[in-house]
């Protein structure tokens, strides 16, 4: 990444912030309306790896999130921008109930449920980036913005319904933006490919509750405005089932099928071959494009 580009992005992020707060009210009606309180909140964090629930201050939790979501050698400005997005996401997520119903906690350490959390990877620069933006969040209409972010857009970002299969009304602050060629993103996120045997697919999909017997076919049935996969039909010896693109990607391991912005998607001779570009859901901040 270029330090100049990161400074510009951070500047744009700061311009978007319409309120600077330290705390949030997490219960009652209109709980995600921005409020300024007197003390830093304490979060309850469900540790998916061990099943325990830990308490920690918001800013300490965010340092672990930034460490889990970014590389350890990026400039402080990049960590600062990421901290604002992560803080905004956390504020909004917890205000809407977090994972209370599932774990009895505010957040979890699952990247699929909330955000990555890797405290052992925290560096001094990461702590600086979090501290220099302490309490800063993005808001829209005096409410916390769900600060979505992903690793690399593949050249174009998506809106929430397309990239995440977001079930609520499309947020007005998410936009699809076409971006210039990226000279900083590594090749493994700019162009990737993966293969799955029919047996692998059967096991992976069954773990997600998709049971159609032996896999006989997988096909894209719908793409969104940015050409990301939005719907997939899985065919098997015991029937067929439709899945959303984001749901399918999570089922087959989102570190292998890096995005739903695919160029090739073909099932032949018992093997599904996929190639594409980008890493992540494509909504919000694209870290490598920053």
Features from the language model and the residues they span:
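N-terminal, intrinsically disordered, polar/charged segments of Gram-positive cell-envelope systems
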Residues: 26-57
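Extended substrate/cofactor- or partner-recognition/assembly subdomains adjacent to catalytic sites
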Residues: 92-272
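Active-site beta-strand/loop microenvironment that shapes enzyme catalytic pockets
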Residues: 272-290
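Acidic/histidine-rich, surface-exposed loop or edge segments in extracytoplasmic proteins
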Residues: 57-75, 107-109, 179-188
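Soluble non-cytosolic domains of exported or imported proteins
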Residues: 53-56, 73-84, 195-196, 280-284
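Post-signal peptide N-terminal segment of secreted/secretory-pathway proteins
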Residues: 70-103
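N-terminal Sec-pathway targeting helices
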Residues: 1-16, 24
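Solvent-exposed, polar/charged alpha-helical surfaces in well-ordered, non-transmembrane soluble domains
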Residues: 60, 64, 77, 81-84, ...
